[in-house]
């Protein structure tokens, strides 16, 4: 038998500035399932994580709440820890980036990079808020777009026309924090020389460490040439001061991934059998896996391995990237009640329902996963209650009534036993490859065969016949053994169901290799219901509660903090001015990302008798543009065509929202037809 593997696993660090929601849980649940599988196989698999606890956003929120940043992150960490535990995410350690271990490791890595010549310094001109006494990041500056004159745009890009620009190009800039007019000031900044690692990264990203789609995307960055990365921020800032540089702090994205190392080091201090150097030093034989969302690939697959290489540490074995979560086919929405916090879900439903549904839909790619709430109810009820638990509930009673709870020996269905044994390696292979959906399909196919066999034998009918009791016991003992096999296969996904089944089966905690054995002449404990069906009313209540969360948040907001306050009405115009704008219904025929543009989608629009090509800065809200195809929207059809770097834009689609992920493409009511005028 091969030696147990040494594996260290991480999930992306949740930001200590808000609650965990079901989109976050998609990552932590899949990581936890993979870790549980490895532990069941007898491998030494350590799962660490931490709260990402630094940055201006945390500093400003703490100030707003009248508490220290330390108090804020402690409160959030307690909330996060509770949510993870109740979702059965079993970290070996959940730490914080605001820790001594992280301070020491961040300083060490920076010092090594500096001594190796990988740190540069130069003066940077930035906007400075004279009222707050702080430099402003791009997202803390708002003003008028220098290209299209749209108001209330961020300091790095226009959400209306898609233009990108430097903050200094913004017209009428204002601090988003204080409302003051910022002034330009120079500041000395520190840069990590990422281009020094171009050759290494080109090889490493193509070495099997990433999914092909991710490696292909990173190739665009690599082919265009890497840029030096600004790793410093000026005081005031909540984070770690750069060694020997008073008033200069590490940018949050420098010390955040180092938080993986820090969390593990914190665990090593409490677990003497763990050796930090054996996992992190160059040449380590241990395996290191990061599970992350596709929005932070650049940090984990370019900056992070380059930092590790430059500082003399090992690089990840693989970075496993997943897509986003949608609910009912659309982005999570607070107004629709589909922006569901982890705690709101837990207040209404069992965590294993969602764990199973995620597992059933997760593949090894980076596609988005849709939580369709109707399908969620149907699938969990059908698969877990109607198939898996049904086997035990069908058979247990006959064994207790007819043989005092003792399973007879013998194999009543050798061909079925062999089918389960034969399937085990394939299921294990699917788990290992993170192809959880395939694993669940294969497991449920076995459950279908077991149920069909029991239904064909009909022990409930035989029990009524004279002299058939031995046959009944043989059938039901076989059924319980098949149920036990299914529990073993599902244990990484459903740890509570497995623990309850182990109690009923009267066995020690099941390991993966236990699928090779059977229970013979074995005493069972009394059967208790292992899982109840999802009641649709509870799902509806969860959605309603999520809407109430939004209303409660709005109720807490001070008067005058609504959308009109943030974005006041424009000056009145004459009707003729409005009438000059030709608004039309448009059918989105094709939607695709624009290569080399971070914000833009290219839309092909049908407006009845002709088609238009339109570039729109809505990519952040619609990461899978193909889902827009076939949808009706509204456009400005008589806007003068505008030549852009990527082509000519022949109009503008209509959308609402402040920007970023909160952009909502407008749609006409059903029945509208492409080309119809909007009046």
Swiss-Prot record:
Cofactors required: Zn(2+)
Record motif 'HIGH' region, residues: 14-24
Classification via SUPFAM superfamilies: Anticodon-binding domain of a subclass of class I aminoacyl-tRNA synthetases (SSF47323), Methionyl-tRNA synthetase (MetRS), Zn-domain (SSF57770), Nucleic acid-binding proteins (SSF50249), Nucleotidylyl transferase (SSF52374)
Key words of the record: Aminoacyl-tRNA synthetase, ATP-binding, Cytoplasm, Ligase, Metal-binding, Nucleotide-binding, Protein biosynthesis, RNA-binding, tRNA-binding, Zinc
tRNA-binding domain span: 577-679
Domain of life: Bacteria
EC number: 6.1.1.10
Enzyme type, top EC level: ligase
Protease recorded as keyword: no
Motif 'KMSKS' region in this chain: 331-335
Subunit structure as annotated in this protein's UniProt entry: Homodimer.
Family: Belongs to the class-I aminoacyl-tRNA synthetase family. MetG type 1 subfamily.
Record's protein name: Methionine--tRNA ligase
Highest classification ranks of the organism: Bacteria, Pseudomonadati, Pseudomonadota, Gammaproteobacteria, Pseudomonadales
Name of the gene this protein is made from: metG
């Amino acid at each position: 038998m091969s030696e147990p593997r040494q594996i260290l696993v991480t999930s992306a660090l949740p930001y200590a500035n808000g609650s965990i929601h079901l989109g976050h849980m998609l990552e932590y649940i899949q990581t936890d399932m993979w870790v549980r599988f490895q532990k069941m196989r007898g491998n030494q698999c350590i799962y660490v994580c931490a709260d990402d606890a630094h940055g201006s956003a945390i500093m400003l929120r703490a100030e707003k709440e009248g508490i220290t940043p330390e108090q804020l992150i402690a409160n959030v960490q307690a909330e996060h820890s509770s949510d993870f535990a109740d979702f059965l995410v079993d970290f070996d350690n959940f730490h914080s980036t605001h820790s001594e271990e992280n301070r020491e490791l961040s300083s060490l890595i920076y010092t090594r990079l500096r001594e190796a010549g990988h740190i540069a310094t130069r003066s940077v001109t930035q906007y400075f808020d004279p009222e707050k006494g702080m430099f402003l990041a791009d997202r803390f500056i708002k003003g008028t777009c220098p290209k299209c004159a749209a108001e209330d745009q961020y300091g790095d890009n226009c959400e209306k026309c898609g233009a990108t620009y430097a903050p200094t190009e913004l017209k009428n800039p204002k601090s988003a924090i204080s409302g003051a007019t910022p002034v330009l000031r120079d500041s000395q900044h520190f840069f990590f020389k990422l281009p020094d690692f171009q050759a290494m990264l080109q090889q490493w990203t193509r070495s099997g460490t990433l999914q092909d789609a991710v490696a292909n995307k990173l190739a665009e960055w690599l082919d265009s040439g890497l840029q030096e990365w600004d790793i410093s921020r000026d005081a005031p800032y909540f984070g770690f001061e750069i060694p020997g540089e008073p008033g200069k702090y590490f940018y949050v994205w420098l010390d955040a991934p180092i938080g993986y190392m820090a969390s593990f080091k914190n665990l090593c201090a409490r677990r003497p059998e763990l050796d930090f150097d054996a996992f992190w030093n160059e040449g380590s034989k241990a395996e290191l896996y990061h599970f992350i969302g596709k929005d932070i690939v650049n940090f984990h697959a370019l900056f992070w391995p380059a930092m590790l290489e430059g500082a003399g540490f090992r690089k990840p074995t693989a970075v496993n990237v997943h897509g986003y979560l949608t609910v009912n086919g659309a982005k999570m929405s607070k107004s629709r009640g589909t922006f569901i916090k982890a705690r709101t879900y837990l207040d209404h439903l069992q965590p294993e329902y969602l764990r199973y549904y995620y597992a059933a839909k997760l593949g090894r790619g980076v596609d988005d996963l849709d939580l369709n709430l109707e399908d969620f109810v149907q699938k969990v009820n059908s698969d877990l209650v109607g198939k898996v638990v049904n086997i035990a509930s069908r058979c247990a009673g006959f064994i207790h009534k007819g043989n005092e709870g003792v399973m007879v020996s013998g194999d009543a269905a050798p061909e079925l036993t062999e089918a389960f044994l034969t399937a085990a390696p394939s299921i294990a292979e699917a788990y290992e490859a993170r192809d959880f959906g395939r694993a669940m399909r294969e497991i449920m196919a076995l459950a279908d065969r077991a149920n069909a066999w029991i239904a064909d034998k009909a022990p409930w009918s035989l029990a009524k016949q004279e002299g058939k009791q031995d046959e009944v016991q043989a059938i039901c003992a076989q059924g319980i053994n098949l149920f036990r096999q299914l529990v073993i296969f599902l244990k990484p996904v459903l740890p509570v169901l497995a623990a309850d089944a182990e109690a009923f089966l009267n066995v020690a905690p099941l390991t993966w290799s236990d699928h090779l054995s059977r229970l013979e002449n074995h005493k069972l404990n009394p059967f208790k219901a292992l899982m109840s069906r999802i009641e649709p009313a509870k799902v509806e209540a969860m959605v309603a509660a999520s809407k109430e969360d939004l209303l409660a948040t709005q109720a807490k907001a001070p008067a005058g903090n609504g959308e009109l306050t943030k974005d006041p009405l424009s000056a009145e115009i004459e009707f003729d001015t409005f009438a000059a704008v030709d608004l039309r219904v448009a059918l989105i025929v094709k939607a695709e990302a624009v290569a080399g543009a971070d914000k833009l989608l290219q839309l092909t629009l049908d407006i009845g008798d002709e088609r238009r090509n339109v570039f729109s800065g809505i990519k952040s809200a619609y990461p899978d543009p193909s889902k827009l195809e076939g949808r009706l929207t509204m456009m400005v059809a008589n806007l003068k065509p505008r030549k852009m770097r990527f082509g000519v834009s022949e109009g503008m689609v209509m959308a609402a929202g402040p920007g970023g992920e909160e952009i909502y493409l407008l749609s006409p009511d059903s029945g509208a037809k492409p080309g119809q005028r909007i009046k």
